[in-house]
Amino acid sequence: MAAVILERLGALWVQNLRGKLALGILPQSHIHTSASLEISRKWEKKNKIVYPPQLPGEPRRPAEIYHCRRQIKYSKDKMWYLAKLIRGMSIDQALAQLEFSDKKGAQIIKEVLLEAQDMAVRDHNVEFRSNLYIAESTSGRGQYLKRIRYHGRGRFGIMEKVFCHYFVKLVEGPPPPPEAPKTAVTHAKEYIQELRNRTIIHAL
C-alpha cells in the first residue's frame, strides 16, 4: 500500500515539474544558444591608445575622448535622431540644444556629454572645458530582453524590452566648418563619374 502511494506521489511530482517547464517558468532571457553575451568594451579601449612621440616642429596632436553609455531603456532609432542633431557641434552648443529638447533621450545624451567633458579635463590634459567638439555621435542596438505578453482566451505572445547604446567621441579644438550642401550639378557629376568607373567583372 505504501509503495503504491509513493508511486502516485512521484508521478504527480513529475507531472507538476513538466507543467512548470512547459509554461516557461524559467526566464527566457537566460535561455539562448548564441555566442557569449559579454559586452565588448572596444569603444572605451580607444582611450588607452598610446601614440608615438611627436617631432619638435610637428603641431600638437589634439586630445580624443571616447565615452559611451550602454543598455539605455530607449529606442535606438529615437536616439539616433538626437545623436545626429549634435554631430559636428561644439560641446557648449550641443549642451544648449539638448537643454531645450523635451525628449527623454536628450537628457541622457546631455549626462553622457557632461561625463565626457569631465573625463577630458581630468584624464586627457584638456586645459579648457569648452574647447571641445563632437566628432562622432551615434547609437547602437542593445541587448533586448524577451518577456511574455498576455492575450485573451489564455493565449500569450513574446514581446521585447528594447535597449540601446550611445557612443560619443570628443576632440579638442574648434569644430570644423560645415560642408556646403551639394547642388544638382555636383550630384550629376558624381553620378557620371561613378558610371565611368564601372568595370566588367571576369573580363581581361
UniProtKB/Swiss-Prot annotation:
The lineage of its organism: Eukaryota, Metazoa, Chordata, Craniata, Vertebrata. Component of the mitochondrial ribosome large subunit (39S) which comprises a 16S rRNA and about 50 distinct proteins. Residues 1-38 form a transit peptide. Its main location: mitochondrion. The gene is MRPL22. Belongs to the universal ribosomal protein uL22 family. It is found in: Mitochondrion. GO terms for molecular function: structural constituent of ribosome. GO terms for cellular component: mitochondrial inner membrane; mitochondrial large ribosomal subunit; mitochondrion. Coiled coil: none annotated. Keywords: Mitochondrion, Ribonucleoprotein, Ribosomal protein, Transit peptide. GO terms for biological process: translation. This is Large ribosomal subunit protein uL22m.
